[in-house]
Curated annotation (Swiss-Prot):
This is Doublesex- and mab-3-related transcription factor C1. Belongs to the DMRT family. Residues 1-12 have a biased composition (Basic and acidic residues). It comes from the Eukaryota. Residues 1-49, 179-216 are annotated as: Disordered. GO terms for cellular component: nucleus. Keywords: Transcription, Transcription regulation. The lineage of its organism: Eukaryota, Metazoa, Chordata, Craniata, Vertebrata. InterPro entries: DMRT-C1/C2_C. The gene is Dmrtc1.
Length: 225
């Protein structure tokens, strides 16, 4: 006699669970419809497809939870048929339908062309824009720097050459002054001393090859070596 009473109680519990599921589904639908009416005035027409997708997701999640509750009730009835009557306190607890309202930013991530939505589309585009190198159009920055280095080297070489010539001329002047003290002014020197003549002071020193240098410069170079 306890079996029919237990089955009736299980049926009543199942009917109560199904009624609560229906109420929750209607509440979810009403809430989604109200949200749609409120956002239709502000959002453009291009986002209608996005809103439809969000509504379909909410309905699918509700259906999945209903199927899970139905499976729990079926397992409870199978246990009752195999073990005897089941008390109402041991029935599976009714779970509410999970509903997570989505923000406008999450809705915008859905692609309008019908492709699967997700946040993976935007990050694939951003790195290509951020990592592009900036092109410089200044011609002065693009010129090679080899010419400046060669110019500096030539300038330093000419300065060293002029310093060497000045030092050699100073040595020759000292040598000639010491020789003129021992010799009269009108007496010409020997053939070796004639080569030790001072260069013209009006002419500036200039770098040249050994073949084109005058005898005074050659003597300067021999003194330096």
């Amino acid at each position: 006699m306890q079996r029919p009473s237990g089955s009736r109680e299980v049926r009543k519990a199942v009917s109560a669970v199904s009624a609560s599921k229906k109420e929750q589904a209607t509440r979810v639908k009403k809430h989604v419809v109200r949200r749609q009416k409120g956002t239709m005035a502000a959002a453009p027409k291009s986002h209608v497809h996005v809103k439809k997708l969000t509504v379909e997701e909410g309905v699918r999640t509700g259906k999945n939870s209903v199927h899970q509750l139905q499976a729990q009730v079926d397992t409870a009835t199978q246990q009752e048929s195999s073990q005897g009557p089941v008390l109402l306190s041991q029935l599976p607890e009714t779970t509410s339908v999970p509903y997570t309202p989505e923000t406008m930013g999450q809705q915008l991530t859905v692609s309008l062309s019908g492709e699967p939505y997700g946040p993976s589309a935007m990050p694939s585009m951003c790195p290509s824009l951020i990592l592009q190198p900036c092109a410089t159009t200044d011609p002065m920055l693009l010129q090679p720097q080899g010419s400046s280095a060669s110019n500096q080297a030539s300038v330093s070489a000419t300065l060293e050459w002029q310093e060497m010539l000045e030092a050699a001329e100073a040595l020759l002047a000292l040598k000639n002054s010491s020789q003129t003290r021992h010799q009269p002014c009108g007496m010409p020197g020997t053939a070796g001393e004639r080569g030790l003549q001072l260069p013209n002071p009006s002419m500036p020193p200039r770098p040249a090859s050994s073949g084109s240098l005058p005898s005074g410069h050659l003597d300067c170079m021999s003194l330096l070596t």
